[in-house]
Amino acid sequence: MDLAPEQKLHGFTVRTREELPEIDGTAYVLDHDKSGAQLLYLRNDDNNKAFSIAFKTPPADDTGVFHILEHSVLCGSDKFPVKEPFVDLLKSSMQTFLNAMTFPDKTMYPVASTNDQDLLNLADVYLDAVLHPAIYRKRAIFEQEGWHYELGGDTEAEAGDSVAGDAVAATETADGSARLVLNGVVYNEMKGALSDPNSVL
């Protein structure tokens, strides 16, 4: 389907059309009439089809809240109330790419598949996850994905771990075998990433 500037289509208005010889295709930018959301449509003959919903997320501080939200919204939604839809999709879909990414200024949720129906299914799950996440009803999701205190852990572990300048308080149980430790999916992911010397070289 060839689109022309100012053409109306399913609640969108075509703003620009540009030939892209590098990918033997055409790029279209459309604006959603009601919300103002922008849609970039790349048309070419590639058998692999992709979809992504993305948001500008410039941070106000270094708490990593957008990275935590990226993980949190993929922990169930109104339409798909399963604990880990992302993991289920990895196992059951014909996807060729499935991920979510937080950059310094944006957060993206891209998917790809060579099967048209599979792509629509993936887009349906991702759109519901992003627009209707279970995090609104289950605060524990945010705490699980971000950071939280847990009683337990290795007493030999470092006592100096910190988040937002707050040192972890070391406590022991009555038998002296456990202490209060920080845990969380994104917390541990970033701790691992930032402990790699190559990340700062």
Task: Label every PLM stretch briefly.
Residues 138-148:
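Short, glycine/acidic-rich hinge or "gate" loops at secondary-structure transitions
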Residues 151:
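Positively charged, phosphate-engaging catalytic surfaces used for nucleic-acid and nucleotide handling
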